[in-house]
Amino acid sequence: MIGKGIRIEGLSKRFGKGDTAVYALKDVNMQVAPGEVVGLVGPSGSGKSTLLKCLGAVIDPSDGRMTLGNEVIYDGGWQVRDLRALRRDKIGFVFQSPYLIPFLDVTDNVALLPMLAGGANAEARAKALELLTALDVQHRVHAMPSQLSGGEQQRVAIARGLVNRPPVILADEPTAPLDSVRAMAVIRILNDMARKFETAIIVVTHDEKIIPTFKRIYHIRDGVTHEEAGEGREFE
């Protein structure tokens, strides 16, 4: 059984072979505890997107080891049989754009994943409503995506990422299109949800407004990471 938190050890990704091989990631080490939100920052082309794709089982790493809770999921090769189930049930995604399905209402946008996993419709909608209530958009459950504000759409996207209670959330530039007030609201929500559901959250960002809120930050440049303590500034 997969538990909580994520640990990455010696993770590398190279393209090509032999003398012509190019490393996009080199010996990356990270650890994110249950209930923790960490920042991953770096310039364009530094390897952030490649790292997220490896962590999300979208592409295969070349070397290294990844552990979710107490289960090794990658050790020189994938240790789980069904990568689609891993992505659906164990790793949640929040993107810069919400990517809500335009012809489904708010509830069904969130409930779709547990339905696809074989859950009963009523149970899936109950899970969706619980999260939408926690995110203070319960009054919009029957609205269509086009009727929502940008901030409401992002909260629905966060609910969708959390609905299967994944141990890990990968958030890729979740505040990029938002002003300062809405950006801080999203980060506050991610922190609240991390604590509530014991989720480990990695936030990839260029957003200078939110970087001071992280207690721990991983910097990545040329595929190499190093960790430093963040300010952990209180939300205004």
Residue ranges of predicted features:
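Helix-to-loop junction immediately C-terminal to a conserved catalytic motif
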Residues: 56
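Conserved ABC transporter NBD signature motif
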Residues: 64-75
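ABC ATPase NBD coupling module
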Residues: 73-92
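Short coil-to-helix segment of the ABC ATPase nucleotide-binding domain corresponding to the Q-loop/switch region
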Residues: 104-113
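Conserved ABC ATPase signature
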Residues: 144-154
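A short, proline-enriched helix->beta-strand linker immediately N-terminal to the Walker B motif
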Residues: 163-167
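Catalytic Walker B motif of ABC-type/P-loop ATPase nucleotide-binding domains
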Residues: 169-172
